[in-house]
UniProtKB/Swiss-Prot annotation:
InterPro entries: FMN-bd, Ion_transpt_RnfG/RsxG
Gene transcribed to yield this protein: rsxG
Top-rank EC class of the record's enzyme: translocase
One cellular component (GO) term of this entry: oxidoreductase complex
NCBIfam families: PRK01908.1, rnfG
Similarity section: Belongs to the RnfG family.
A single MF term (Gene Ontology): electron transfer activity
Keyword annotations from UniProtKB, A to Z: Cell inner membrane, Cell membrane, Electron transport, Flavoprotein, FMN, Membrane, Phosphoprotein, Translocase, Transmembrane, Transmembrane helix, Transport
Species assigned in the record: Salmonella typhimurium (strain LT2 / SGSC1412 / ATCC 700720)
Name of the protein in question: Ion-translocating oxidoreductase complex subunit G
Major subcellular location class: membrane
Topology term for the membrane: Single-pass membrane protein
Top-level taxonomic group: Bacteria
Length: 206
């Protein structure tokens, strides 16, 4: 009787150990898969704001942290694009703090000469049917930044038409596009300062 109990106890212990090990392996595999999918989604998003033929380095391995008021409160990431090891452009995370329903998060692709190469909204809480037209899936409005050059902080073209600029506002929603235009402009201007900062920037993960 005692031998039988011990035998069953050992069997259960081995089963439990095996189950725990299998669960750990599955969890690790799941984490790896989720991480890989996140990287692929990020890469696809990068392609929308920075033409792949402009650089030949791994952007995701060229990530730096910056604390710049021009990009909004807190720390933001910048990804430096290089062509044959020469810095040529950047993808910059930026925050428009003055959206109608709160902060709007964006990424902006820009070269170092004041030209915006593309931008996309990554997070917002704007009103459905009005301010949410900043999303690419709902409107092509966000694509109108591509190829636009900023001549300086006082460039009047970088405003919505209601304020005398070149960018359309939305019917019934001016605050949202105004916030995005201003945030993209600030990010584009900030990009011009990046080459000089590169030796001093903190790499992501450090």
């Amino acid at each position: 009787m005692l031998k039988t109990i011990r035998k069953h106890g050992i069997t259960l212990a081995l089963f439990a150990a095996g189950s725990t090990g299998l669960t750990a392996v599955i969890n690790q595999m799941t984490k790896s898969t989720i991480h890989e999918q996140a990287l692929q989604q990020q890469h696809a998003l990068f392609d929308q704001v920075l033409p792949p033929d402009r650089y030949n380095n791994n952007l995701q391995e060229s990530c730096y942290l910056v604390d710049a008021p021009a990009l909004g409160k807190g720390t933001h990431r910048v990804f430096i694009a290089r062509k044959d090891d020469k810095p040529v452009a950047a993808i910059i995370e930026a925050t428009a703090p003055d959206g109608y329903s709160g902060a709007i998060q964006l990424i902006v692709g820009a070269d170092f000469n004041g030209t915006v190469l593309g931008t996309r909204v990554t997070e917002h809480h704007e009103t459905p049917g009005l301010g949410d037209k900043i999303e690419r899936r709902l409107s092509d409005w966000i694509t109108h930044f591509s190829g636009k050059t900023i001549s300086g902080e006082n460039d009047t073209h970088w405003a919505v038409k209601k304020d005398g600029g070149d960018f359309d506002q939305f019917t019934g929603a001016t605050i949202t596009p105004r916030a995005v235009v201003n945030a993209v402009k600030r990010a584009g201007l900030y990009a011009e300062s990046l080459p000089a900062q590169l030796p001093h920037l903190t790499a992501c993960g450090e």
